[in-house]
Amino acid sequence: MSGAPVSGRYSGLRQRVLTALVLIAALAVVLFALPPAATLALVVVAILVGGWEWSAFVAPTRPALRAAFVALLALGIAAAWPLSGSRSGMLALLVVAGLWWLLAVFWILRGPQRVGAVLAAVAGIASLVPVAVALGRLRLEPGQGAWVLLFALLVIMAADVGAYFAGHRFGRIKLAPSVSPGKTWEGVIGGLLFSLIIAIVGARLLGWPVAVVAPLAVGAAAFSVVGDLMESLMKRHSGLKDSGHLFPGHGGILDRFDSLTAGIPLLTLGLLQAGLVGEGWPP
């Protein structure tokens, strides 16, 4: 056994857990105590903060260009939002997002090769605009928007939690060592299993068919790993360890919620295609 004190071995984990509990409490307040419009505003603010963090991948030493990227991101969200008011428009947006994440898989497989500012900016817009719109539309689901959004968040975040603990306990085979050395296939499998459990429980509570929701959730959770790896890849391109320092033990907005950038749009696409969401969304 190691002679290191228990407090030393688990201090990092304790900090992560405490931060996560605070975030969960804040999420509950945002979803169930605030009106939908306030939730939408906070979603946009959070995405723009994430955009500021992403801008460090674009032009780390040029504040004016970083601010320009955030402004471009805001314009992208503003342009995409009215498009998402119709089923066909939302489907088009989410399909484009899905194609982007498929392309991202091949980019990640190439490993941490440097990219220019323009490509980094395009990747940021493609990653952040769809998740902002999808989160907003899920919250506006008539009757149970807060619960639907909570379900989607928990499914994707469960993949993170399951991967963290399964990877630490059983991790042996590296997933993408040149991009994120700490991630393992065992962790991914553990994350998918935890997402599946959350999806089954959530589907039953929402009155949705488990046979439809479970595979959608697992597929979205699998792609959430791509969102995580994409942020890791961009950090390696930029020589950064964390995207920010907003959350103790978790880094910045992107470090905490990078998996949502891929997982939420693809889960929303599946739920929309299955007819489980999207009826009665306001324009």
Model-flagged regions — what are they?
Residues 19, 56, 163, 231-234, ...:
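Hydrophobic side chains within alpha-helical segments
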Residues 237-260:
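Interfacial loop-to-transmembrane junctions
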Residues 168-169, 235-237, 261, 265-266:
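Re-entrant/interfacial helical elements at transmembrane boundaries that shape
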Residues 269-283:
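Juxtamembrane boundary at the C-terminal end of a transmembrane helix
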